[in-house]
Amino acid sequence: MKIGVLALQGAVREHIRHIELSGHEGIAVKKVEQLEEIEGLILPGGESTTLRRLMNLYGFKEALQNSTLPMFGTCAGLIVLAQDIVGEEGYLNKLNITVQRNSFGRQVDSFETELDIKGIATDIEGVFIRAPHIEKVGQGVDILCKVNEKIVAVQQGKYLGVSFHPELTDDYRVTDYFINHIVKKA
């Protein structure tokens, strides 16, 4: 399968490496037209305000709002998928969640921890960098993981969102789950 990574900012190469380790083809998506070539899309981390500005500039907002592609958002990608963002309007409105930006603190408060992610594994390494958390989930959203009582991973149908950066580790099981359990079944 061909899985795209929105290549406007963030750890694009690292996500593509995880896609390839999962046995699939990774494509850096830089143009809206490329969405026709893929079966699923990863929205990488970075700075969420910048990501939204770039998505507006290159026409991705409307295209992705209207898209039926399965999507996986990490960190800022999670924020972009959310229906609501504390103090702001949602953006793509794909996940029925409310997200709090930077809720784990500033850059100096970044941390790594082992995660037990329902349906994936009990020993996933999570890298949290200025990470958001999911403050509230709506109907149809499955909570997959919490850290210190804060929700950090959810799934709603063909949409997966995590607060952390799985692509910054050698463990590709979260990406593999997205492709082989979400994209394949969509």
Curated annotation (Swiss-Prot):
Keyword terms: Glutamine amidotransferase, Hydrolase, Lyase, Pyridoxal phosphate
Residues the record lists as binding L-glutamine: G46, E47, S48, R101, I129, R130
EC number(s) reported in the record: 4.3.3.6, 3.5.1.2
Reaction equations catalysed: aldehydo-D-ribose 5-phosphate + D-glyceraldehyde 3-phosphate + L-glutamine = pyridoxal 5'-phosphate + L-glutamate + phosphate + 3 H2O + H(+); L-glutamine + H2O = L-glutamate + NH4(+)
Active-site residues, as the UniProt record annotates them: C75, H165, E167
Name of the protein described by the UniProt record: Pyridoxal 5'-phosphate synthase subunit PdxT
Gene3D superfamilies: 3.40.50.880
Any one GO biological process: glutamine catabolic process
Gene that this sequence comes from: pdxT
Subunit structure: In the presence of PdxS, forms a dodecamer of heterodimers. Only shows activity in the heterodimer.
GO cellular component: cytosol; glutaminase complex
Domain of life: Bacteria
Entries under HAMAP family matching the protein: PdxT
Role of this protein: Catalyzes the hydrolysis of glutamine to glutamate and ammonia as part of the biosynthesis of pyridoxal 5'-phosphate. The resulting ammonia molecule is channeled to the active site of PdxS.
PROSITE patterns: PDXT_SNO_1, PDXT_SNO_2
